Amino acid sequence: MPRSQRNDNFIDKTFTVVADILLRVIPTTRREKEAFSYYRDGMSAQSEGEYAEALQNYYEAMRLEIDPYDRSYILYNIGLIHTSNGQHTKALEYYLQALERNPALPQAFNNMAVICHYRGEQAIQQGDPENAEAWFDQAADYWKQGIALAPSNYIEAQNWLKITGRLKA
């Protein structure tokens, strides 16, 4: 049974019903509907922490989906899973792929910045301040790009940029 038919919580059920109605009403191909179904099941599995199942669904959605904009969100969600699993290098790769298809994803820039900032903190703990500065500079670059797309978001990042003197650079 597809995951979308066994959702237990109200929000997932509501999303599934609305998505099913939209799929019936909006003229789309069978392939597009199937891709969206896998994407929807991937989101459901991801929200429940079932990352392996979510990845399987996202990979199937990627196999079927041809629209670059829609693919960007699939790639972004794959990046989220790799971030959650601590696979930061893989996550960065998927976020970059998402941005190649849709450069207007501030959340991808933010997540890449968070990973870079984390790596900077790790470098400090390892006694490598030069490497830490490079990671922090990269984080700043990503945050600036995300903030440019969503100026009212990422207030903590904006404050960090101001405090560290990286806002104007």
Curated annotation (Swiss-Prot):
One of its GO terms (biological process) is photosynthesis. Keywords: Chloroplast, Membrane, Photosynthesis, Plastid, Repeat, Thylakoid, TPR repeat. It is a peripheral membrane protein. Its main location: plastid. InterPro entries: PSI_Ycf3_assembly, TPR-like_helical_dom_sf, TPR_rpt. The keyword Nucleotide-binding does not apply. It is found in: Plastid, Chloroplast thylakoid membrane. GO terms for cellular component: chloroplast thylakoid membrane. The keyword GTP-binding does not apply. Disulfide bonds: none annotated. TPR repeats lie at residues 35-68, 72-105, 120-153. Belongs to the Ycf3 family. Essential for the assembly of the photosystem I (PSI) complex. May act as a chaperone-like factor to guide the assembly of the PSI subunits. This is Photosystem I assembly protein Ycf3. It comes from Chaetosphaeridium globosum (Charophycean green alga).
